[in-house]
Amino acid sequence: MSDTASQQHNPAQLYCLPDGKALVLRTCNAELQAHGGFQWPESGPVSCPDWDPKPKCGNGLHGLLWGQGDGDLVSWNAEAKWMVVEVEAAACVELSGKVKFPSGTVIFCGDRLGATALVAQHAPAGTSIVGGTATAGTWGTATAGYSGTATAGDRGTATAGDSGTATAGDRGTATAGYSGTATAGDRGTATAGDEGTATAGDRGTATAGTWGTATAGDRGT
């Protein structure tokens, strides 16, 4: 089995990101087809047949550089395949909420958590990865992107994007975006967006947006 194929089935396997390369997160349907019917490989090299570097959508392969961008541009269907593509960083063209690139190498194809975990291992510090999970220890800070989950230890700060879940320990602060859930420990502050749920411990403050539910512990607000 090739190294790439092995990584596909075991994203935790040690992977060394070459100099000048970056990782792009993207999704395909169960048949590995993208919008418009472009066929992606399960692993290995892939290229766009009609590449155009102009900063407009189309004429390129598309995805979220380091997993950052518009979470509405990936598929959240249960059958969706999540891919990690190694690309030339300098070749990426910034678009609205995503990037496009001429070619790359698929190094992972599988589930969301496997893909986002692989990206997180190599992404710049503080990167908010769409669909990812971020966990920090005591005094730490955890930030997750759209639909992600962020958990921080005591006195930490946890922030999750839209539809995400944020949980902070004692004296922590948890903030979740639209439709998210935020839970903070004693003396913490929990803030959830519209339709979210915010729960704070003793002496905490819980704030929920429209249609949300806010629950604060003893002496809380």
Describe each PLM feature range.
Residues M1-T221:
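Short, glycine-biased loop/turn motifs at secondary-structure junctions and
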